[in-house]
Curated annotation (Swiss-Prot):
Residues 22-136 form the Thioredoxin domain. GO terms for biological process: protein folding. The lineage of its organism: Eukaryota, Metazoa, Ecdysozoa, Nematoda, Chromadorea. This is Endoplasmic reticulum resident protein 44.2. Glycans are attached at residue 264. A motif (Prevents secretion from ER) lies at residues 410-413. Disulfide bonds join 184-233. One of its GO terms (cellular component) is endoplasmic reticulum membrane. Gene3D superfamilies: Glutaredoxin. It comes from Caenorhabditis elegans. Residues 396-413 have a biased composition (Basic and acidic residues). Keywords: Disulfide bond, Endoplasmic reticulum, Glycoprotein, Signal.
């Protein structure tokens, strides 16, 4: 073989290595053809759903691509893939994951979709730090029972497991912890401390009841373990905050909101028990939430209420807000369910219009008595426009901003 042939062969080999290396160092295009392979190819797969017609997508794409390059330069051995979906050409993928705005960034861990999207700063530093966090361990270690008692925040949801770290049971727990790391804190003993027991144990510690729930199923059944931990870590009734309200609105279900005094949460449990008792089968139709009545004073104002009236229960349908008429009846069997079912049947809206004048008079009196003013204060109920409706939704205004996203199907929110 002459020198020219050798040089040509070396150049071809170098090109091949470079191309293969680029698969992992740059953002790749995710399609239905490579979907399963890509999602299963790394511990973390970070996906940006973009559309060329969307100005926010056009701004994000070069930042996302640069983030992928920077991340892999700094972390060449990391098990992570950055991928971009051209949502015009690959609409099926967007439909598969219910993408209704662009850009949307989702993360998959061990091939499974994490519920919470990435919604933070769109910068190289922020994006790379996010992927590093997803790759970091989601499990805390303790070397003694005293250390666990001192470091475990009992105001949060905690899962404590005693499992051999070289077994499939621990591998299952690691996968579950990676998915639910933002919903629960996970704890395992150090290798030395863990040898004090030979039995597999998994417990959940409820911050509300201070009770311990023990897992009694098959530790090798990943789906069963995941479902058990998920049911414990994601409660039936959640707290709505300004930080999570955007993602809650995207779940698309009307809010059943229990506004209460943040310094007096004694009735939280009462509300939770009422929801579990009467609305458990409505989990896919209503979103029961707790809200700080001081921070969310604006929705209360729309209902003619102030912090002096707390607790207050209302439904926000993303079109209108409906007030639970008598808080003393919340624990009467059937009343809470009736309130929710009346929303679904349209009865709440119908009843409001049938008694419109009287309700507007009552609302005006309530606002006047509490010194609440709004844009309509000078109008007598009889002079209101004929299409006057229940108080408009406030939480709809907290949905994803059209200053950051191109929103699809706006009428559904």
């Amino acid at each position: 073989m002459n020198l020219a042939s050798v040089l040509l062969l070396l150049a071809a080999c170098h090109l091949s290595v470079s191309v293969n290396g680029q698969e992992h160092k740059e953002a790749i295009e995710l399609s239905m053809a490579n979907h399963d392979h890509v999602l299963g190819s790394a511990q973390v797969v970070f996906v940006a759903f973009c559309a060329d017609w969307c100005p926010f997508s056009r701004r994000l794409k070069p930042i996302f691509e640069e983030s992928a390059r920077v991340f892999h330069q700094e972390n060449p051995q990391a098990s992570a893939v950055w991928a971009i979906v051209d949502s015009q050409r690959q609409a099926d993928i967007g439909d598969k994951y219910f993408v209704n705005k662009y850009p949307t960034m989702k993360v998959f861990v061990n091939g499974e979709l994490i519920t919470k999207e990435y919604r933070s700063t769109r910068s190289v530093e922020a994006l790379t730090n996010f992927v590093k966090f997803q790759l970091s361990t989601a499990i805390n270690e303790f070397s003694s029972q005293d250390q666990l008692n001192q470091e475990m925040d009992k105001s949060k949801r905690n899962v404590v497991a005693w499992l051999k770290k070289d077994g499939p049971e621990f591998a299952n727990l690691k996968k579950v912890a990676s998915i639910l790391r933002e919903d629960c804190s996970f704890w395992v003993p150090t290798d030395h401390f863990g040898t004090q027991t030979n039995d597999n144990k998994l417990s959940f510690f409820d911050p509300d009841s201070n009770e311990e729930a023990k897992f009694t199923g098959n530790f090798n059944d990943y789906d069963f373990v995941k479902q058990w931990v998920t049911d414990k870590c994601i409660p039936l009734v959640r707290e709505v905050t300004f930080e999570n309200v955007e993602e809650l609105t995207e779940e698309g279900m009307p809010f059943l909101i229990y506004f209460r005094d943040p310094d007096n949460k004694t009735t939280d449990k009462v509300f939770g028990e009422a929801v579990a008792r009467e609305l458990y089968d409505q989990r896919s139709a209503i979103n029961p939430l707790l809200a700080d009545g001081h921070k969310f004073a604006h929705p209360l104002k729309h209902l003619g209420k102030t912090k002096e009236d707390l607790p207050v229960l209302a439904i926000d349908s993303f079109q209108h807000m409906y007030l639970f008429p008598d808080m003393t009846q919340m624990n009467i069997p059937g009343k809470l369910r009736e309130f929710v079912m009346d929303l679904h049947s349209g009865k709440l809206h119908k009843d409001f219009h049938e008694n419109l004048d009287q309700r507007m008079i009552e609302l005006a009196k309530a606002k006047a008595a509490r010194g609440i003013t709004d844009d309509h204060e000078a109008q007598a109920p009889s002079t209101r426009p004929i299409d006057t409706t229940p108080p408009p939704s406030v939480f709809k205004e907290l949905k994803p901003s059209d200053k950051r996203y191109s929103i699809l199907q706006k009428s559904e929110l």
